[in-house]
């Protein structure tokens, strides 16, 4: 299989809900169109930002199918298939219809806190179970365990279909170590909007973005400029969004970006429990910043 290269700005797509708690599939397709029309380079479907743990198997299958049909090959689809049970991920890869999926995203197992050898064996089993490109996802703030640079590089060297890592450890030194020592066919992708610009200057190839749900045109332009070496103009855009970066996660993800999308009139401000909407004080701060940026409110 030809190796997919996920470069530029990917968006970790949210799942819009109606007031009755059902999935708003019409709003979902509008959001996909919004991304396609505004420079998004690839979509990350059914990741953390999609509130995937709260979705049923039927809902996940329908969301995947609708998005793949709407995108119709125009940009790559990165599908989240994470679980803290290795066997469950392997069975998903073997049994689910992966037509239209370009690569899969798999987080380090959460809650059961495996050792570095356990993490390696988890990804080894997954890489050997599929011909699809696999993207590692290191997010210790959610999983409770950090995948070290040594483990990441071991996986990158041992398996040709492990093509990238979404790095959200917040440890720039660790990320730089991976970038400096990685094989040529392995990429580092930022998992944090706020460090996308500095990480690209070190050699990362892009971001899987949360804020890109709301601002795909602006943030994809920043990413593209940085990748082209136009750091001055990229930095100007980066600084434009600094306050919003910090507000995104004050009340948890995707509460922040859903509030932004609601202010912009694109979705209902609805999450599924145990997640709840952002506080009114945060909401009003976002509204004020969006007005200042002359974003439609």
From Swiss-Prot:
It holds the Pfam family DHDPS. SMART domains: DHDPS (SM01130). One of its GO terms (molecular function) is 4-hydroxy-tetrahydrodipicolinate synthase activity. Transmembrane segments: none annotated. It is an enzyme of class 4 (lyase). Keywords: Amino-acid biosynthesis, Cytoplasm, Diaminopimelate biosynthesis, Lyase, Lysine biosynthesis, Schiff base. GO terms for cellular component: cytosol. Its main location: cytoplasm. The active site is at residues 137, 166. The record marks 48, 111 as: Part of a proton relay during catalysis. It catalyses: L-aspartate 4-semialdehyde + pyruvate = (2S,4S)-4-hydroxy-2,3,4,5-tetrahydrodipicolinate + H2O + H(+). Its EC number is 4.3.3.7. PANTHER family: 4-HYDROXY-2-OXOGLUTARATE ALDOLASE, MITOCHONDRIAL, DIHYDRODIPICOLINATE SYNTHASE. Catalyzes the condensation of (S)-aspartate-beta-semialdehyde [(S)-ASA] and pyruvate to 4-hydroxy-tetrahydrodipicolinate (HTPA). Homotetramer; dimer of dimers. Belongs to the DapA family. This is 4-hydroxy-tetrahydrodipicolinate synthase. It comes from Phocaeicola vulgatus (strain ATCC 8482 / DSM 1447 / JCM 5826 / CCUG 4940 / NBRC 14291 / NCTC 11154) (Bacteroides vulgatus).
